[in-house]
Amino acid sequence: MNKIHIGILGAGKIGTAIYNLLVISGFDYDITVADQNILNDINTCDFQRLEIGEDECMLDDEFDKFVKDKTLIINALPYHLNFTAYKTCLEYNIPYFDLSEDDFLDKWIEKKRYISSTRTGVSFTMPHCGLAPGLSTVIANYLMEDFSTVHNLKIRVGALSQHSSNKLKYHTSWSSDGLVNEYKGNCQVISDGKYAEVPALCGHEKLTINGQDYEAFNTSGGIGTFAKTLVEQQKSCVNVNYKTIRRIGHLDYVDFLFNDLDLPNDMLVDIFRNHVTETTKDCVIIFIEI
């Protein structure tokens, strides 16, 4: 049996975390991480410098070679590079795993009918295998099995710093590109038994978890295609929604930046990437109520 060779696209925070977990897993995988620059703690013998762009016409043979000789590909690139990776894996029939929560990519996949209950003849692909969508929707689906009818399903997820020291009540610990995308897209819900989409940064609520007060609000992509799947499978669900958990006061500031000032994406990414301090002392909250 050939040794499993895993290709990781992206050497940022998430790509490096995946790499380190695979290295210590004990399964002795061959692992190669590809990016334009080596950014973090990756063994140089496991790294390949590779130009990865949005324009397919600019891709060279090196990208194709990287993909087609791997057992599987894990995509840890910024969301706007997903199309390149996804389509190349389909072309060479390489299993593809994607952690992103990009609503635009979901719609593209659905339009192409690459993911369906009767799909045949294309490679195995698994979008939405991160935290949200991913772990949180798996837990929610498991909890639903004990109910014949679900009146309300609330999925609340927050990736937060353990402490906050700024007025934003937030410190970055992952992709700034992904954060901005999450705060700007449409949000998928089931409302009164019907699939619908609502704007990000609305639906504000307060909640208390383990004695700590938080706020939550709609953000894009965190539920993936879960709401649409429940409707298509004719599950008896009245209201289903996903919201991001933050410390109280965060929404007022981001609503001002995103909606009142209507700052362009590149400026928003720059603010979160270069002007909001990072932290490695983070915590993840998953709160599901059914």
Spans of features found by a protein language model:
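Conserved N-terminal Rossmann-fold NAD(P)-binding element of oxidoreductases
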Residues: 6-10
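Hydrophobic/small residue at the entry helix of a nucleotide-binding pocket
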Residues: 14
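NAD(P)-binding Rossmann-fold cofactor-contacting core
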Residues: 30-43
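Rossmann-fold cofactor-recognition segment
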Residues: 45-57
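Conserved Rossmann-fold cofactor-binding substructure of NAD(P)-dependent oxidoreductases
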Residues: 55-67
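Beta-loop-alpha module in the N-terminal Rossmann-like domain of NAD(P)-dependent dehydrogenases
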Residues: 72-91, 104-107
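Rossmann-fold NAD(P)-binding glycine/threonine-rich loop
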Residues: 100-125
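C-terminal catalytic/substrate-binding lobe primarily of soluble NAD(P)-dependent oxidoreductases
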Residues: 146-290
